[in-house]
Amino acid sequence: MESSPDPGELIKSSQPSFFEFQKQASLMTSCNLLWKELSEHFTSMEQNLMKKSEALRQMIETLDNQTQSSIELLKHREVTIDHSVEIAEGKVEERVRAALDSLEKARDCGDEDTGEVDDGDGLLSALKSLCLKMDARGFWGFVIARKKELENLRSQIPVALVDCVDPPKLVLEAVSEVFPVDKRGGGEKVSNDFGWACVVILESLIPVMVDPVMGKSRLLVTPSVKEKAKEIAETWKASLEERGGIENVKTPDVHTFLQHLVTFGIVKKDDLALYRKLVVGSAWRKQMPKLAVSVGLGDQMPDMIEELIIRGQQLDAVHFTFEVGLVHLFPPVPLLKAYLRDAKKATALITDDSNNSGRSAHLVARKEQSALRAVLKCIEEYKLEEEFPPENLKKRLDQLEKTKTEKRKPAVIPANKRTRASYSGPMPPAKAGRITNAYVSSFPPPPPTFIRSQSHSPQYGVPAYTTSPPTIYSNRSPPYQYSPEAVHGSYQTSPVSYPTAYGTYCSPVAAPPPPVYHPHPHHHHHIQHAYY
């Protein structure tokens, strides 16, 4: 008979299988999770590769288009260069003939006086005459003498330079008086800054050198002129050390240098770092954003704007932002508000100056007004009224203007009456006793502040003379002095005499008895003349 299996043995043999099943199930779960992660990772990589591939394809396509357009442009420039040169030569011949005719007329009629110009036509005629003669020194003197006619000069100089035989040569010779190195004397150099004239003349030269076929994309500058312009630029850069470095260069000089580079097309990529420092140091100039782009700093504009913001020049940063179209990266309204906050902090520091409170208040008002006007002008220029309503700023500006006007009004000061040193009553005019018609007072005379000399005292045996009260002597002063002792009687102490100039010659009212004063003997003479 077969024995039945032991249940305990069955249980022992089944336990390893159950644990193994759990282990395999856990392993399958881990494999599923890993597969899912790997699938997502490779899918993401595939998508990124596809995006990058598409971006590269677009870049290659863009470069191909740019290359093709550049090749076509070069072909067009090559084809048109001969025609442009022919046109330029024809213009030069016409200018030469016009210059010769002008010189002949000048010899026949005498030199015209270009010093006095009444209107725009006269200004243009004078400029044309100087350009035809290639009179660089006269041209320079004519321009610098008319700074008040700056707008007319901007519009008329390019027209006049068209008639010049060699406009670049005339311009370089004209500005050579102060650029690249100022050749004037010390006194004139300090008093007059002619950087504005250099900039106007250099700007006016650009439309004259524009290619008649290609337009502004190509300037007709001869190799000799370009080499001369490069030498001038190198001379200016070499003079920076003598001026104390970039930080000490004047803004008009920086503006002239950058405009010189743009006008003659002599920008160097190796000097971009120098150009950036110069632009940031003179960023408040209105033309600086355009010049920065023209000298090849367009790619560095975001970093330059960040630098301006860090330096506290938010207003300049706004101008740069709009010039290069980076408004989406640097919103203008927060920058303008930050500029106003910084201005308010600066005024608070000035207010803390307790040494000169009046001057501090004036500086605070002026600085705040300047900041408000600059922000209002920026809002108007870039049409930011919806984002930054200017009403509150205008109200604040009007309030400051009103306060400034009220402070300028003269204060009403009451007239002070002249009084004696030892008496609170009114004092008669200083010249009352010196004129023929003596002043007649309706008040009793104040008491004197001095004692009669001891030599006139009765205790030394000299009796006090008596006299009747004075009579009216019409318009004349009494011919003699009288003693007030006759009116008031004798005193127990030394009597007091009254000054002649302030006696009651024409007053019937007797003066009250004055108190006795005993000043120091050395003060006798000083006090006696105190009223005169």
Swiss-Prot record:
Nucleus keyword on record: no
Task: State which residue ranges cross the membrane.
Answer: none
Name the keywords, alphabetized: Developmental protein, Differentiation, Flowering
A GO BP term here is: cell differentiation
Expression by tissue: Expressed in leaves, shoot apex, flowers and during seed development.
For this protein, the record's InterPro entries field holds: Frigida (IPR012474)
Q: Which family does the UniProt entry place this protein in?
A: Belongs to the Frigida family.
The family database entries (PANTHER family) matched by this protein are listed as: FRIGIDA-LIKE PROTEIN 3-RELATED, FRIGIDA-LIKE PROTEIN 4A-RELATED
Q: What is this protein called?
A: FRIGIDA-like protein 4b
Gene behind this protein:
FRL4B
